[in-house]
């Protein structure tokens, strides 16, 4: 096939034909005289395409003289250069563009091109381009090529060469060339064809196919033609009572007008025999006169354009027709957004009805016909073609009744009608029926077939995407044939509509929360035990709690709604995947995610935190309870962030002093409150401030609490502990635990030991006895994967009181810092007492790895403190004061009372905000000393209390040797607790579940084993919730040597500094709660003093109760 893009070299053409100048080179117009030699025209040159004005026409001045097939013509036919629209640049002329740009430009182009005298005015003659003609339209070209298209007249050739010599580059077949005379004859025939369709109009001439009937002229003529009476030539008068015969039509017309019409001036009624008006009078005489033309066939109004033989019975029709020559389209579509213009109002109405409305008011009322059309012209056409020329359509045919079901064949009807109709009908539109069906364009299909598929008429809406083509209003529909679904027009309009539609759809389909963050929402789904942030979260609705980006990532609930990662998809990238987060936030998120995932002690490894004891931890505190609370508050979580804990992000910090996480255990959770899964690594040690891991843990716990019945600390009777951050439900939450705590009031020091249910929230602050399934036992060295649940050794101050698993006790064994679970019984408290995470949250040592985490909802269980940081691994695991049996009702009550008291004191201390000052000392002694022995020597109490509390300090220093290494977290927690106590002083101490037994009497000056009360544990900062080591089962009181395990508050105060993370992390401010003031140690000292003063009594009470 000829490559239109490659212009044939001039020389190549010279052989068969005379050399032709390039399109830029003007060629003298070819006249008959200009041609010499045998006049042969290559038909392909004459018509590259039957419907295009293309070079074929340009090159074809066959009527003027024969031209050999010229490659130029072929090239011009195929290639369109980006030349100006100048009428002279035929090769590059884009008819549609020209028409759209200026209807007149096309006319000018045609006029300039049409130099042949062969008969067309301003355009090729009717027959020249008409596809309806039996011969190719290109042969009808009569114009000599204009200079721009000029084809040099073929020079004299040898006849041998002059014959059709297919040019090697010529594209298309080389039919036998027609002599000029033959062409002239054909052209004459074409002109003689009674094509009332405006084939004579440039729009209709052969352009129809390229334009797909988009030119207005065609439709106008079609309409006119329909309106025009049949080409009748009547010479006999059929007026009632008159039978005169005349020699000519003119005589008959004169007779009628003078004798019948003017003779009956009072009544304007047609008495012509068989008139469809049935004697219905007209309103005016001129109307009757015009009507009579229908009977006589008179068409006095003739087109004045050269070569146009059109004539009309009505002047208005002639005017409309003339617009086809001039390109004028004064009638604009009134539909909003539709830019189509028409040369006559009827065409516009037709377009509007077809494309912008499904209504088909024009019904064929002939018997047995149910066809309906959108416009009268289509109806007339239908009647004329289907029912015959004698069946006249009148206004009576317009149906007002309900639209009958449009027969599906209606779409096919146009074609059939065209086929059955006169040649002019066919000549009008040669567009395939298929192309026309979808489009209601009257021009494309027979106008009568407005029944084009309903989609055609309705679908062609500007707003809708019309695959069919020029939807109504499409700019492509250049011609009045608005319906004419020009293929090109269709493509353009369709493309436009598609583009618009795509845009709309894109806006509508825009995915929510496509931040690209892969972190799964950390939110916990109610009581679901799973804390993991990963896929389990996907099941959860994305909310601040469920959203991985939400509170867990310190992102507001709003952001959680747009969680970048699917709720169920684990945030593989962790917080780091959140591009918008600050490093601290990323770290926090990672820690939380890690703890939630149980991935490890590191923030990222804490992912296992989400499932403690192999079971997903339900949030310990309901989000509802702590709407403003965000376990990650200490972390960079915004106050607007959901209060829910970041799903089991590893509470890398030691339990917070006031964190009831160790104590708070959903009473209803049988090991489900929070999974103290030894495998859930708590990012206890995580470099991020304990607040992050702690908060994460607390968030996770809070989430777990939430689903659990009675999970809320309040529900569990831990209301007094409500102030304690639930995130540290394990008691190691970390300074941020306060943030995690429902009560933002907690300062960093008020971190719950575990991410377990907020000590203040959910069921018991202390782990509920046997409420949680036994988490996988973990060695103290190994922190449960649910590190988020249990502060790592670092979080616990590096020491985790090793308490027998809560499973052993049937209840969570609460380490002192962890505080006793407020749950069912002292056993629940025992974990709190026993669970004394070491101060260093960095070590995600499963605090309760040894405990059946699930057995009680131990907030202090290893879930929060999955693995104490190695640095803070308890130098010596302190036996947690596990309440082996729920029978310690009295002792537990006492312990609980003491814990409550201690918690209150710790709250005071926390409120003092000196927790951060507490050195990260003695994370080793996680035993109740921290909690029970929360009595810190005033000097120590005065020592800066680490706001993060033991095990919560972002940097849990190794436990100070001065204090029990393991309890140091306790001390720290205590100090933190003191800060929190002070902080919580404002908030009444949570009522921890009665500690089964408080560790020995608290010694003010010495390191008294902190009460199993989670508050104490939190205050102590030690892993109050840490369960005793797997094998260790001890009564919290028994296992706790209260005398020996005296809290060295000075050491605690000193130690929390290293252990406690910055108060900012722990503060609830981010969670919307007032973070416990993380003031200097001296602040905590005041609280500590109060605590110390109260501790002796508490200790004695505990001892007596023990």
From Swiss-Prot:
Subcellular location: Cytoplasm; Nucleus
Amino acid composition bias (Basic and acidic residues), ranges on this chain: 413-428
Gene source species: Homo sapiens
Crosslink position(s): Glycyl lysine isopeptide (Lys-Gly) (interchain with G-Cter in SUMO2): 1003
Induction summary: Isoform 1 and isoform 2 are amplified in glioblastoma cells.
Composition bias, Pro residues: 754-766
GO biological process assignments: cerebellar cortex morphogenesis; digestive tract morphogenesis; dorsal/ventral pattern formation; epidermal cell differentiation; liver regeneration; lung development; negative regulation of canonical Wnt signaling pathway; notochord regression
Database matches in PROSITE patterns: ZINC_FINGER_C2H2_1, ZINC_FINGER_C2H2_2
The family this protein is said to belong to: Belongs to the GLI C2H2-type zinc-finger protein family.
Name of the protein in its database record: Zinc finger protein GLI1
Gene from which the chain derives: GLI1
Subunit text: Interacts with KIF7. Interacts with STK36. Interacts with ZIC1; the interaction enhances transcription activation. Interacts with SUFU; this inhibits transcriptional activation by GLI1.
Tissue-specificity statement: Detected in testis (at protein level). Testis, myometrium and fallopian tube. Also expressed in the brain with highest expression in the cerebellum, optic nerve and olfactory tract. Isoform 1 is detected in brain, spleen, pancreas, liver, kidney and placenta; isoform 2 is not detectable in these tissues.
């Amino acid at each position: 096939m000829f490559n239109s893009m490659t212009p044939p070299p001039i020389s190549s053409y010279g052989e068969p034909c005379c050399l032709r100048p390039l399109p830029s080179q003007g060629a003298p117009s070819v006249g008959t005289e200009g041609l010499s030699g045998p006049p042969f025209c290559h038909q392909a040159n004459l018509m590259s395409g039957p419907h295009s004005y293309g070079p074929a026409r340009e090159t074809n001045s066959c009527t003027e003289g024969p031209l050999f097939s010229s490659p130029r013509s072929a090239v011009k036919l195929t290639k369109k250069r980006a030349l100006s629209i100048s009428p002279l640049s035929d090769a590059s002329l884009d008819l549609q563009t020209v028409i759209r740009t200026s209807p007149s430009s096309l006319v000018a182009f045609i006029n300039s091109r049409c130099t042949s005298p062969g008969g067309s005015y301003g355009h090729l003659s009717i027959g020249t381009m008409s596809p309806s003609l039996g011969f190719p339209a290109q042969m009808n070209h009569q114009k000599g090529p204009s200079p721009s298209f000029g084809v040099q007249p073929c020079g004299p050739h040898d006849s041998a060469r002059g014959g059709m010599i297919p040019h090697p580059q010529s594209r298309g077949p080389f039919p036998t060339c027609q002599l000029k005379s033959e062409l002239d004859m054909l052209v004459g025939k074409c002109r003689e064809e009674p094509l009332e369709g405006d084939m004579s109009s440039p729009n209709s001439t052969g352009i129809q196919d390229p334009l797909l009937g988009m030119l207005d002229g065609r439709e106008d003529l079609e309409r006119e033609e329909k309106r025009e009476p049949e080409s009748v030539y009547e010479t006999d008068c059929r007026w009632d009572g008159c039978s005169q015969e005349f020699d000519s039509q003119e005589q008959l017309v004169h007779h009628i007008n003078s004798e019948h019409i003017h003779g009956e001036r009072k009544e304007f009624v047609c008495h012509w025999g068989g008139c469809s008006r049935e004697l219905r009078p007209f309103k005016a005489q001129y109307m009757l006169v015009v009507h009579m033309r229908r009977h006589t066939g008179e068409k006095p109004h003739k087109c004045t354009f050269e070569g146009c033989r059109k004539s009309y019975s009505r002047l208005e029709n002639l005017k409309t027709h003339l617009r086809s020559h001039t390109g004028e389209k004064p009638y604009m579509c009134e539909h909003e957004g539709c830019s189509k213009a028409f040369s006559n109002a009827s065409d516009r109405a037709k377009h509007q009805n077809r494309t912008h409305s499904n209504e088909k008011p024009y019904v064929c009322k002939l018997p047995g016909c149910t066809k309906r059309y959108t416009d009268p012209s289509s109806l007339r056409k239908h009647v004329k073609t289907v029912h015959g020329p004698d069946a006249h359509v009148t206004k009576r045919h317009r149906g007002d009744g309900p639209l009958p079901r449009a027969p599906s064949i209606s779409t096919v009807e146009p074609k059939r009608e065209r086929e059955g109709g006169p040649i002019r009908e066919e000549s009008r539109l040669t567009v395939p029926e298929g192309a026309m069906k979808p489009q209601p364009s009257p021009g494309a299909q027979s106008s009568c077939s407005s029944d084009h598929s309903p989609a055609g008429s309705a679908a062609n809406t500007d707003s809708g995407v019309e695959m069919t083509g020029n939807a109504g209003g499409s700019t492509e529909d250049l011609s009045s044939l608005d319906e004419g679904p020009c293929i090109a027009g269709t493509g353009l309009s369709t493309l436009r509509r598609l583009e618009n539609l795509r845009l709309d759809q894109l806006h509508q389909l825009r995915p929510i929360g496509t931040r690209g963050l892969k972190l799964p929402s950390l939110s916990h789904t109610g009581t679901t035990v799973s804390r993991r942030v990963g896929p389990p979260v996907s099941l959860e609705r994305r909310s601040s709690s469920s959203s991985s980006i939400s509170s867990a990532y310190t992102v507001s609930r709003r952001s959680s709604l747009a969680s970048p990662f699917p709720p169920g998809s684990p945030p593989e990238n962790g917080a780091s995947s959140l591009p918008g987060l600050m490093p601290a936030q990323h770290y926090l998120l990672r820690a939380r995610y890690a703890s939630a995932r149980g991935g490890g002690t590191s923030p990222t490894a804490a992912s296992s935190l989400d499932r403690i004891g192999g079971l997903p931890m339900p949030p310990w505190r309901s989000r509802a309870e702590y709407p403003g609370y965000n376990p990650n508050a200490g972390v960079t979580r915004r106050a607007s962030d959901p209060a829910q804990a970041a799903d089991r992000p590893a509470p890398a910090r030691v339990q917070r002093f006031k964190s009831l996480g160790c104590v708070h255990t959903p009473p209803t959770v049988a090991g489900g409150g929070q999974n103290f899964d030894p495998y859930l690594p708590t990012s206890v040690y995580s470099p991020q401030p304990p607040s992050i891991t702690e908060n994460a843990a607390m968030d996770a716990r809070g989430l777990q609490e939430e689903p659990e019945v009675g999970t809320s600390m309040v529900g569990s009777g831990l209301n007094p502990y409500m102030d304690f951050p639930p995130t540290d439900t394990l008691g190691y939450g970390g300074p941020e635990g306060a943030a995690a705590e429902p009560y933002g009031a907690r300062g960093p020091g008020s971190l719950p030991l575990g991410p377990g249910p907020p000590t203040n929230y959910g069921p018991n602050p202390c782990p509920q006895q046997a409420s949680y399934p036994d988490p996988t036992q973990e060695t103290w060295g190994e922190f449960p994967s649910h590190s988020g649940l249990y502060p790592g050794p670092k979080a616990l101050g590096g020491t985790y009181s090793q308490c027998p698993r809560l499973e052993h006790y049937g209840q969570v064994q609460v380490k002192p810092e962890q505080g006793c679970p407020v749950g069912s019984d002292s056993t629940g408290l025992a974990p709190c007492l026993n669970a004394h995470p070491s101060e260093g949250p960095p070590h995600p040592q499963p605090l309760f790895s040894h405990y059946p985490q699930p057995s009680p909802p131990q907030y202090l269980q290893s879930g929060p403190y999955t693995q104490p940081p190695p640095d803070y691994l308890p130098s010596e695991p302190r036996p947690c004061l596990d309440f082996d049996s729920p029978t310690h009702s009295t002792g537990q009550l006492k312990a609980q009372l003491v814990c409550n008291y201690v918690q209150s004191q710790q709250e005071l201390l926390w409120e003092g905000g000196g927790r951060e000052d507490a050195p990260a000392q003695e994370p080793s002694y996680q035993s109740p000393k921290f909690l029970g022995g929360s009595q810190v020597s005033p000097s120590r109490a005065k020592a800066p209390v680490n706001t993060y509390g033991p095990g919560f300090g972002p940097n849990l220093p190794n436990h100070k040797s001065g204090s029990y290494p393991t309890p140091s977290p306790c001390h720290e927690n205590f100090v933190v607790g003191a800060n929190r106590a002070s902080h919580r002083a404002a908030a009444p101490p949570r009522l921890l579940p009665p500690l089964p037994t408080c560790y020995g009497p608290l010694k003010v000056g010495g390191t008294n084993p902190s009460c199993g009360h989670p508050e104490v544990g939190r205050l102590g900062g030690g892993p109050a919730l840490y369960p005793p080591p797997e094998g260790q089962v001890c009564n919290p009181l028994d296992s706790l040597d209260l005398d020996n395990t005296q809290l060295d508050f000075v050491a605690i105060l000193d130690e929390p500094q290293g252990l406690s993370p910055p108060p900012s992390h722990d503060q609830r401010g981010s969670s919307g709660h007032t973070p416990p003031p993380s003031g200097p140690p001296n602040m905590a000292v005041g609280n500590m003093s109060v605590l110390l003063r109260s501790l002796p009594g508490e200790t004695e009470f505990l001892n007596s109760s023990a």
